[in-house]
Amino acid sequence: PAWLVDCPCVGDDVNRLLARGEK
């Protein structure tokens, strides 16, 4: 979500979770 990406810290954490889900 855009509101999550707005925060670098949260965005980075979300990216990790998304990367895990993708694999």
Curated annotation (Swiss-Prot):
Described purpose of this protein according to its UniProt entry: Major toxin that belongs to the bicyclic heptapeptides called phallotoxins. Although structurally related to amatoxins, phallotoxins have a different mode of action, which is the stabilization of F-actin. Phallotoxins are poisonous when administered parenterally, but not orally because of poor absorption.
Chain positions listed as propeptide in the UniProt record: 1, 9-23
Family of the protein in this entry: Belongs to the MSDIN fungal toxin family.
UniProt cross-link 2'-cysteinyl-6'-hydroxytryptophan sulfoxide (Trp-Cys), position: W3-C7
Cross-link (Cyclopeptide (Ala-Pro)): A2-P8
Alphabetized UniProt keyword annotations: Thioether bond, Toxin
Name of this protein: Phallacidin proprotein
Keyword check for Iron-sulfur: no
Domain of life: Eukaryota
Lineage, broadest ranks: Eukaryota, Fungi, Dikarya, Basidiomycota, Agaricomycotina
Keyword Cytoplasm belongs to the record: no
Description of post-translational modifications: Processed by the macrocyclase-peptidase enzyme POPB to yield a toxic cyclic heptapeptide. POPB first removes 10 residues from the N-terminus. Conformational trapping of the remaining peptide forces the enzyme to release this intermediate rather than proceed to macrocyclization. The enzyme rebinds the remaining peptide in a different conformation and catalyzes macrocyclization of the N-terminal 7 residues.
Recorded GO MF terms: toxin activity
